[in-house]
Amino acid sequence: MSLTHRDVATVGIGGPVGSGKTSLLTALVPELRDQGLDVGVIANDILTQEDADVLRERFAGVVPEDLVAGVETGACPHTGIREDPSMNLQQIDSFLADHPELDLVLVESGGDNLAATFNPELADYSLYVISVAEGEDIPRKRGPGVVDCDLLVVNKTDLAPHVGADLDVMEHDANEVRDGPVVFTNCKDETNIDTVLSHVRDGVLFA
């Protein structure tokens, strides 16, 4: 895989509000650090630094504080990751100016609809996270975020019996609408986080 014009691999994580993007980051980043990788994290939001502040606290002692940044898009979340990713690209440049040793930057989108996708100048590899609680029918709605991402993550599998979602149906529908891999996760107990990690490493670091 050819990377963006920057000398660092970039992974975009998108998905609706409440799907578990921040929880997935929380699970992935310490594992990446344990494997000896230098990681930066960018959290996009419309008007606040809320997610970035949460991640700085969670990654204290794991990731240097200046490698966790918030980008306030001031507009629809997809604008900052697709139509005009300049603020995110500038933040990556800022990371690299102070930390040229960086191996990987993870970019979390603000919560958005099923149409959100990443500009290829921003993300070498993209994950799209949906939650079981959003409804069993989400995969078959064929949103570009679901269909076009490199890896679809179906999160919060522990909630399936409580919301009447059939995971087998979701898996079947997801495989019907997309050619890429699908992983079912529960970030609370880190079910299949290792599988997500393997896809990220194989898809962007060792491609």
Curated annotation (Swiss-Prot):
Ligand binding (GTP): G15, P16, V17, G18, S19, G20, K21, T22
GO molecular function: GTP binding; GTPase activity; nickel cation binding
Main location, first listed in the record: cytoplasm
SUPFAM superfamilies: P-loop containing nucleoside triphosphate hydrolases
A biological process term (GO) from this entry: urea catabolic process
Keyword Membrane part of the UniProt annotation: no
A Pfam family the protein falls into: cobW
Keywords for the protein's UniProt record, in alphabetical order: Chaperone, Cytoplasm, GTP-binding, Nickel insertion, Nucleotide-binding, Plasmid
Gene3D superfamilies assigned to the protein according to its UniProt record, in alphabetical order: P-loop containing nucleotide triphosphate hydrolases (3.40.50.300)
Position of the signal peptide: none
Top-level taxon in the UniProt lineage: Archaea
One of the record's GO cellular component terms: cytoplasm
Localization annotation: Cytoplasm
Complex formation: Homodimer. UreD, UreF and UreG form a complex that acts as a GTP-hydrolysis-dependent molecular chaperone, activating the urease apoprotein by helping to assemble the nickel containing metallocenter of UreC. The UreE protein probably delivers the nickel.
Entry function: Facilitates the functional incorporation of the urease nickel metallocenter. This process requires GTP hydrolysis, probably effectuated by UreG.
Family stated for the protein in its record: Belongs to the SIMIBI class G3E GTPase family. UreG subfamily.
NCBIfam families: ureG
Descriptive protein name: Urease accessory protein UreG
Organism: Haloarcula marismortui (strain ATCC 43049 / DSM 3752 / JCM 8966 / VKM B-1809)
Lineage: Archaea, Methanobacteriati, Methanobacteriota, Stenosarchaea group, Halobacteria
